[in-house]
C-alpha cells in the first residue's frame, strides 16, 4: 500500500498529456492533447480516496476499500474501485504496484479487458501504455506521455 500511495503522491498536480491511440480493426489512429489535474483525497466511510483525476469534463475517482481487502503474502496487489461522472457504473480494477515509480491496472467490464501501465521516466515525465481487448483479442493500443507543469 505504501508504494501505491507514493505513486499517487508523486502524481499530484497539473499535467499536460499527449495520447496516441491505434484502433486495430479499422486501422484508425488518433492523437489527443489534454490537461489533467490530480488531487489526493480524504478517507470516507472505510475507504481511502487515493486520487481524484480531472480531464476537462471527465472526472475519475480512485478509492481503496480497506475493509474489503484481504491481505495476502504479496502486499503489492489491490482491488480498487473507479467511479466517474459519465455514468453510475463502478468498475472494479486489479492494481499491481511493485515500486513507487510503476503501477499497473487491469479492468474487466463484460467481455472487455483493459490493461494499463504507468511509470515515471523522471519526476516530471510520466509515460503509459494501454491495451484494450475484447474477447481476448486486442482491438486497440494507446501510448501516452504526460509532463508536469
Swiss-Prot record:
<keyword id="KW-0456">Lyase</keyword>
<dbReference type="GO" id="GO:0009507">
    <property type="term" value="C:chloroplast"/>
</dbReference>
<keyword id="KW-0934">Plastid</keyword>
<dbReference type="GO" id="GO:0016829">
    <property type="term" value="F:lyase activity"/>
</dbReference>
<dbReference type="InterPro" id="IPR018536">
    <property type="entry name" value="CpcS/CpeS"/>
</dbReference>
<dbReference type="InterPro" id="IPR012674">
    <property type="entry name" value="Calycin"/>
</dbReference>
<protein>
    <recommendedName>
        <fullName>Chromophore lyase CpcS/CpeS homolog</fullName>
        <ecNumber>4.-.-.-</ecNumber>
    </recommendedName>
</protein>
<keyword id="KW-0150">Chloroplast</keyword>
<comment type="similarity">
    <text>Belongs to the CpcS/CpeS biliprotein lyase family.</text>
</comment>
<comment type="function">
    <text>Might function to covalently attach a chromophore to Cys residue(s) of phycobiliproteins.</text>
</comment>
<dbReference type="Pfam" id="PF09367">
    <property type="entry name" value="CpeS"/>
</dbReference>
Amino acid at each position: 500500500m505504501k508504494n501505491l500511495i507514493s505513486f499517487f503522491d508523486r502524481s499530484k498536480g497539473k499535467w499536460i498529456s499527449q495520447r496516441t491511440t491505434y484502433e486495430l480493426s479499422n486501422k484508425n489512429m488518433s492523437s489527443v492533447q489534454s490537461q489533467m489535474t490530480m488531487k489526493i483525497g480524504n478517507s470516507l466511510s472505510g475507504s481511502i480516496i487515493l486520487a481524484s483525476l480531472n480531464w476537462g469534463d471527465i472526472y475519475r475517482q480512485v478509492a481503496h476499500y480497506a475493509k474489503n481487502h484481504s491481505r495476502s503474502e504479496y502486499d503489492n496487489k489491490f482491488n480498487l474501485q473507479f467511479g466517474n461522472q459519465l455514468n453510475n457504473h463502478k468498475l472494479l480494477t486489479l492494481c499491481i504496484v511493485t515500486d513507487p515509480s510503476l503501477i499497473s491496472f487491469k479492468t474487466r467490464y463484460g467481455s472487455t479487458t483493459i490493461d494499463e501501465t504507468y511509470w515515471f521516466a523522471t519526476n516530471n515525465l510520466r509515460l503509459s501504455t494501454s491495451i484494450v481487448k475484447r474477447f481476448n483479442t486486442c482491438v486497440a493500443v494507446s501510448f501516452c506521455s504526460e509532463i508536469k507543469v
